[in-house]
Amino acid sequence: VDSEKIAWVLTNLLSNAIHYTPENGRIIIGARQQDHSVEIYVQDFGKGIDPRYHQSIFDRYFRVPGTKVQGSGLGLAISKDFVEAHGGTLSVDSAVGKGSTFVIKFNV
């Protein structure tokens, strides 16, 4: 495992959570073991992502329409590539107005 790449992914997910969470908002970072896998998650309580964009946000250069936060649209695509190169998955669970949870999952 390339720990630097996984650290980069976590830093990117945390940075996104900070940018999309209102001032004094809450962000949760955690890990849990599920049967034969380990999950690391970053959860925010920001504006959330419309479900129709849940797959597209992992595409290079994609930006959710109306997003005001600066960015290149590369962070999540690169994060997904790094995680998948290590045999894992990166997914999102999000609803508009309720925030987002990004989950990195590795089989153990």
Can you describe what each PLM-predicted range is?
Residues 24-36:
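Short beta-strand/loop element within the Bergerat-fold HATPase_c
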Residues 75, 79:
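Short alpha-helical Gxxx[C/S/T] motif in the catalytic ATP-binding
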Residues 1:
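Conserved micro-motifs of the catalytic ATP-binding
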Residues 17-18:
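Short helix-loop "hinge" at the ATP-lid/N-box region of the Bergerat-fold HATPase_c
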Residues 44:
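Acidic ATP/Mg2+-coordinating residue in the GHKL
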